[in-house]
Curated annotation (Swiss-Prot):
Name this polypeptide is given: ATP synthase subunit alpha
Taxonomic superkingdom: Bacteria
GO molecular function ontology, one term from the record: proton-transporting ATP synthase activity, rotational mechanism
Organism: Lactococcus lactis subsp. cremoris (strain SK11)
Main function: Produces ATP from ADP in the presence of a proton gradient across the membrane. The alpha chain is a regulatory subunit.
Assigned protein family: Belongs to the ATPase alpha/beta chains family.
Enzyme class of the recorded protein, top EC level: translocase
NCBIfam families, A to Z: atpA, PRK13343.1
Compartment(s): Cell membrane
Positions bearing the site annotation: Required for activity: 362
Amino acid sequence: MAIKANEISSLIKKQIENFTPDFEVAETGVVTYVGDGIARAYGLENAMSGELVEFSNGVLGMAQNLDATDVGIIVLGDFLSIREGDTVKRTGKIMEIQVGEELIGRVVNPLGQPVDGLGELNTGKTRPVEAKAPGVMQRKSVSEPLQTGLKAIDALVPIGRGQRELIIGDRQTGKTSVAIDAILNQKGQDMICIYVAIGQKESTVRTQVETLRKLDAMDYTIVVTASASQPSPLLYIAPYAGAAMGEEFMYNGKHVLVVYDDLSKQAVAYRELSLLLRRPPGREAYPGDVFYLHSRLLERAAKLSDDLGGGSMTALPFIETQAGDISAYIATNVISITDGQIFLENDLFYSGVRPAIDAGSSVSRVGGAAQIKAMKKVAGTLRLDLASFRELEAFTQFGSDLDEATQAKLNRGRRTVEVLKQPLHKPLAVEKQVLILYALTHGHLDDVPVDDVLDFETKMFDFFDANYADLLNVITDTKDLPEEAKLDEAIKAFKNTTNY
């Protein structure tokens, strides 16, 4: 049988063309140090800042320090199973996280992995954890209100969709309660909420999740948790992971509320990592870029222009103060980044004023534009009235001889303080907030004993629901007050049916 050379050569060519090697080319290095959530590796000469690397045990890390001889890596997982001498390879990718509607109702860690025992998650969509904030021309002014359901906030320091409003105060002053109430009030408002718990006890996070689940708020909420027992790198990236999840909804024309509880612990985790990576310390041993740590996160919250779908992401960052010191380093940084702050005061909290909002120190720099007309009319002078009441109250300690006008101001002020109190997890619809504030500012509460104000409020709401629902509907539909004569008449009718 004759051997045909051309057939053999064509077969060999085909074999060569179809040959695929079963190996991959990757730049690898060797771990020279590991501990406390960081690793150093020699040999990754072309690694880029923020690039993901993979250790030989499958754990991922992120390149942070690019030194002349080695690379400083933060370990995104269990660093205890990594040993000196292990190999580490570049992946050529940046860190991405799962995003999408499948996350709603779930509790996940900062890597997007579920920790609630409700099964695996595979959304099929990812977004980079670190993303560039929208530019000036991609945004528009804050114009829609975000109702928190808390009278003290919606009246005195209103928040708009797309705003960044800092919640600041000592530990145990009700910061988390304010945010949970704001989340509860988004039910039926076409809003998706993301609660990012940073450095909290796992038992505390579980309690918050159970509260949200019991009150049906998990139907529109995602919880991202990096608990106190987890390594610092996870606490550092948790807020960015929450922001990435929110951006997916925002860029699809939806409205998102993201709560960062709290950024003080993220700053501490970042300080720890920076010192371990041998970066030069600055004030209070924080690294020089700690301002950028928070500014690049909070700038991602925005109200997008109509061309981009008009979606929004509202941020409620928390900062924990020490003994009410709002002039501390991290506190002043975040105050300067955000569009206002709500200051919760220890003394008010312990005197029974809850939420313990200090009207004098709290401000909203852009939310006023988003406040509904009805609320603007009834709450316009409330801040000033409350501030002058606090001042007068301090003076009355020195003497009891007061003229009638001063006495009237004090009486109105005491009732204002009572009206702004609110029970936990009982957010109030905006039309009912307007109603009670109208009654207060138009003198209908002046003859009601201070101790009975909250009882008066509850009974008045029930009375209006039963007999004057049309007046409440006018506020809901038109966002403006109904005829004042009709409102006055209805409130008087209620007072005639009671002992007030």
